[in-house]
Amino acid sequence: MRRFYRGIFIVWVALRYGLDELVLTSFQKPWLRVVARIVSIGRNLDAPRGQRLREALERLGPIFVKFGQVLSTRRDLLPPDIADELAFLQDRVPPFPSAVAIATIERAFRRPVGDVFVQFDETPIASASIAQVHFATIRTDEGEVREVAVKVLRPSMRGVIEKDLALMAMMAGWVEKLSPDGKRLKPREVVGEFDKYLHDELDLVREAANAAQLRRNMASLELVLIPEMFWDFCHPEVIVMERMNGVPIAQLDRLRAAGVDIPKLARDGVTIFFTQVFRDGFFHADMHPGNIQVSLAPETFGRYISLDFGIIGTLTESDKEYLAQNFVAFFRRDYKRVAELHLESGWVPEGTRIDELEGAIRTVCEPYFDRPLKEISLGMVLMRLFQTSRRFHVEIQPQLVLLQKTLLNIEGLGRQLDPELDLWHTAKPFLEKWMVDQIGPKKLFQQLKAEAPRYAKLLPELPRLLHDFLENRPADHRRELLELLAAQKRTNRLLQTIIYGGIGFVLGLLAMQLLVRVRLF
């Protein structure tokens, strides 16, 4: 019954804020268009549609606010005005009672809170839709007393989330069935992505593991501090981490008064991000100002402090290769190659004309080359490409959308700190090394070495599969045959590249020696 009433409330809010015009007006059935006109009688719909959608999500509560935040990153699906407005959604939720937080801690560790902590501050210092944070002190196994931050999951969140997700999935199914435009927006896919995102955030141990990985990765950089996790005090509903003392990065006057080099801070932020993306393929994907502080402690003065590791982006080797080749093609203004990469990735529907896709990409990218490099926003280039992709129904991978969103955040933060920030100058060393690592001879040798055992096992099967294929039994073996042919093609390409590269290197050495001898004589 509660689910029924919740569904009625959601429909009422949607009608109240005029969200029916986003859906009902695209229905093909005439009677549904009549319904759209009827329900819009007597309402003031002067506000832009993006603003009305944002206000409706805020009215529906924190889970829908979270959904809007995730939806704002899908610029490959949403019109720009709606995506821009959803980016303003803020996760503001009143704290839950400290007695409930203490009960959660005692249930997680099966002992009184006084036995878990030396001291526990009952007043929360931060609160969001998923969890809230308290300060405390603990005694380690070595007898050392440490100041910590305790993150406690909001009670009954799982039940609330499951109910709202079920309603979202049901409504997404309706939209896909009744609206052609709605089906193109892939509502069920978006809700499924949100489902995974929320369940990841509900497991606080996962967040602790993300923080531990980032801390290891960033240890040698000495530009950013990641809190240490105390694993003996971590549970899916409670995690305990090192307390970080810093100044919020938005408080620029305090930072300047303390003597922090603000332009260097801007460059360091870009360096941190590109290191995480290009070197590690594991990046903090929620780097808005609320999650960033700056240390004023003498031994770590001016370093970033990262907080909240619930959203992490990862890039596979395939993702890196795709990005590397796109960057090369982009700077060569080879838009046909960019279009081919989209087709080769399998993200473009069959039948897409490559010349049309190439023309659309050229329209997006070409205007940027008339600007100084420091004025080019890589995040905006990616965003425009994703928006163009909507016309061709390109399936942009979630991790690349997350990368684009984070890159926009970093660029915005960097230029807020230093309007003269030259993003490309700061990023150039990382890009150059990354290109060498991704498409240089060392990478080719690594690929050949890694894949040689697999090819050695598969290639002897090729004659048999080819014979079976020619004997009119393609259904059973077509997939395996194509896989082997592709493997053989990759192997040949690697070998040719290595051989030609080696020959070129030797010829280059001989030419240099010849030139030296000519000069000597």
From Swiss-Prot:
Pathway: Cofactor biosynthesis; ubiquinone biosynthesis [regulation]. Residues 119-497 form the Protein kinase domain. The active site is at D286. It comes from the Bacteria. The keyword ATP-binding applies. ATP binds at I125, A126, S127, A128, S129, I130, A131, Q132, V133, K151. It is found in: Cell inner membrane. Keywords: ATP-binding, Cell inner membrane, Cell membrane, Kinase, Membrane, Nucleotide-binding, Transferase, Transmembrane, Transmembrane helix, Ubiquinone biosynthesis. One of its GO terms (molecular function) is protein kinase activity. Its EC number is 2.7.-.-. InterPro entries: ABC1_dom, Kinase-like_dom_sf, UbiB, UbiB_bact, UbiB_kinase. It holds the Pfam family ABC1. One of its GO terms (biological process) is ubiquinone biosynthetic process. It is a single-pass membrane protein. GO terms for cellular component: plasma membrane. The chain crosses the membrane at residues 496-516. It is an enzyme of class 2 (transferase). Belongs to the ABC1 family. UbiB subfamily. Is probably a protein kinase regulator of UbiI activity which is involved in aerobic coenzyme Q (ubiquinone) biosynthesis. This is Probable protein kinase UbiB. The gene is ubiB.
